[in-house]
Amino acid sequence: MEVRTAKTAGFCFGVKRAVATVYEEIKNGKDKQEIIYTYGPIIHNEQVVSDLENKGVRVIYGKEDLKSITEGTVIIRSHGVDRETYDMIRSQGLKLVDATCPFVKKIHRTVEEKSRAGYAIIIIGNEDHPEVQGIKGWSESDTYIMNTEEEAEKFSIFPGKKLCVVAQTTFNYKKFDKMVEIIAKKRYDIVVVNTICNATNERQVEA
């Protein structure tokens, strides 16, 4: 059996950028003896996480962990976080380094702007994924998360309500397209922002 490695295999731009950010902070903080934390493991790679731990980097696993920290640097990983987490880091006087993927940041801005303008927000993605949890935390209006065509079929909202649809950056593009089609048939006033990362789409096509 022949095994081929896809041209697009490997870590995406956002993850590489986040990892590089942590190593840069380690380098810059050597003389200061400053404790560096990442909000969640910076990458799903045990070797990299272990190497960072050996260099003194600690992992925060949620807001309860964050509450106990009184000094140091907190690095936000590529998945991003909700607005409340940013506020907590700043209010505790910690140094904030934001390594959120720029594509995820764009979703945060879109959700914030549209929700403030009165749109209900639909996030197509996995509700348990940290990226989706972070996106939800930027909405200031009704927010719905769905992951299947069945959920899209069942979705219902007051007819006069405006909708803005975004997606988890790693969601399957064909599935997203189909779910949007289902929602659009319900004749709501809808704005669709395709926020699936180009790298994700390329990998799905290559697969």
Explain the meaning of each model-derived region.
Residues 1-207:
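The feature marks the mature, well-folded catalytic cores of soluble enzymes
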